[in-house]
From Swiss-Prot:
PROSITE patterns: ABC_TRANSPORTER_1 (PS00211), ABC_TRANSPORTER_2 (PS50893). Residues 350-560 form the ABC transmembrane type-2 domain. It is a multi-pass membrane protein. It comes from the Eukaryota. The lineage of its organism: Eukaryota, Viridiplantae, Streptophyta, Embryophyta, Tracheophyta. It comes from Arabidopsis thaliana. SMART domains: AAA. InterPro entries: AAA+_ATPase, ABC2_TM, ABC_transporter-like_ATP-bd, ABC_transporter-like_CS, ABCG_dom, ABCG_transporters, P-loop_NTPase. It is found in: Membrane. This is ABC transporter G family member 23. Keywords: ATP-binding, Membrane, Nucleotide-binding, Transmembrane, Transmembrane helix, Transport. Gene3D superfamilies: P-loop containing nucleotide triphosphate hydrolases. The chain crosses the membrane at residues 369-389, 402-422, 450-470, 480-500, 511-531, 595-615. GO terms for molecular function: ABC-type transporter activity; ATP binding; ATP hydrolysis activity.
Amino acid sequence: MASCFHPSAMATSHREEDSIILFSASNSPDEFSSASSSFSSSPLPTPNRYSLTVTNLSYTINHTPILNSVSLAAESSKILAVVGPSGTGKSTLLKIISGRVNHKALDPSSAVLMNNRKITDYNQLRRLCGFVPQDDDLLPLLTVKETLMYSAKFSLRDSTAKEREERVESLLSDLGLVLVQDSFVGEGDEEDRGVSGGERKRVSIAVEMIRDPPILLLDEPTSGLDSRNSLQVVELLATMAKSKQRTVLFSIHQPSYRILDYISDYLILSRGSVIHLGSLEHLEDSIAKLGFQIPEQLNPIEFAMEIVESLRTFKPNSVAVVESSSMWPENNENDGIISKKEAFRVLDVTEISYLCSRFCKIIYRTKQLFLARTMQAVVAGLGLGSVYTRLKRDEEGVAERLGLFAFSLSFLLSSTVEALPIYLRERRVLMKESSRGSYRISSYMIANTIAFVPFLFVVSLLFSIPVYWIVGLNPSIQAFSFFVLCVWLIILMASSLVLFLSAVSPDFISGNSLICTVLGAFFLFSGYFIPKEKIPKPWMFMYYVSLYRYPLESMVVNEYWSMREECFSSGNMGCLMTGEDVLKERGLDKDTRWINVGIMLAFFVFYRILCWGILLRKASKSTH
């Protein structure tokens, strides 16, 4: 199996001086030879100018080889395009180089070098490499400028507000986003159109370029774009590589003729192995030596994809291999940048404040969460009030109050499901941002709590005020205040549960099914349908973990404790049922409601801690 390898920097004005450089997949790093002497006079790279070398990179998953002895060299100021059929390992290669794949799964002989220095801590790659995934994981309800400003706040901690503003303005100008800077990013669908696909891709690139990484990796940046937008994106990358002296690698499936003009070198993969690495001219030479003629309607890359099996078997007479470190003499100025480790940050109040600000904007702009949720609470409160208007203080009224409490709980707990798609959408952004060190997941959870708790308190008030006074529940202000507290805690518990289940659910359908199943089980074992004494022992644990049980008991105690001497049913023998009898029948007393408040708070915190743990684990394995 042979591969063509020729860094474009070796090209001279005389074609006969060019050499087709090939290497076998079995070659070791020791077999690399020096480049021509023309590189000895090359100036040292300036700080943050990096050359990248990958040698013998092999990667296997579940005994299935994904990459087989892949070697490459990439220079700053130029673009290296990774080309190959679908499933050939292009995305995996970029993720490994960017430090987004567990390096323990790599072959021990595999190595990634920057400026002739081997990277031993693959976490450094996340800091040195910007990575733009194929999917544009952005928050649709932020404007283009807001998206970049928040990225700058998270990434440029040591910069002043003015410096961050200038950095954002510069990127908006460089990437041609000035005219859409105040437009919402959107998702590209009919309901939330936002900016165009090409503009959204440029926003994704800008987000990565905020911190000015020396190496930029992009996974299929032209995927889903028309030819015009694809050309604009590649042209932008080429301009940025030259003007900023950045090393750019991206995968592409089938580049057009016009795109080829902006790419310096090509790495062609087939079945995880290198088929060609070098310039377009050298690929044409290899194709010609095989006896093929490139059709006029196809460019060399497209034709190479058609004859990839022939290229796999092509073995040249002579082999010479170049290590990229020979292009760039070892640069001591960058040593500190490569070896520097980020200091551990304690609880960052500024980080949390930025996240809180972003959450508040998203809540306000999310119609189904802000407007629909508030209107839903008001309508439900008025609706229940109209059904249970002025309940009587008799035995029938006692049963109706219990039904009101149970239905209210069912409504309040199930109404939080509508936040599931929002959490799932944010989770993708969270994985990307937290995995690259923008902020910690603990900060995200704290900010989420701070932003949502006041909003959910407003929702609880909007529900409680109409239903409480129209129904005619316990008229004391203390009882009303506790009812509002109870409703608030119910919603908080439910939001934590949904947040936790969104962390373990792969998509909306499975998440919605899981939430409905869990809530249904909690309601069944709340003690409303089946008394505690009748619950089978194997299911008794559900009675204690049910989110319905504790608020239901608290509402009953709140309603009848101050009226425990009041008679709700009388007969010839006198009073047959007092408020105290109602409580005794359910095994409740005054202390129950405050104990239950503590338990509800514990559930609220518990589910958020579980969510934090799951997200933390997922972020550590994230490839975004």
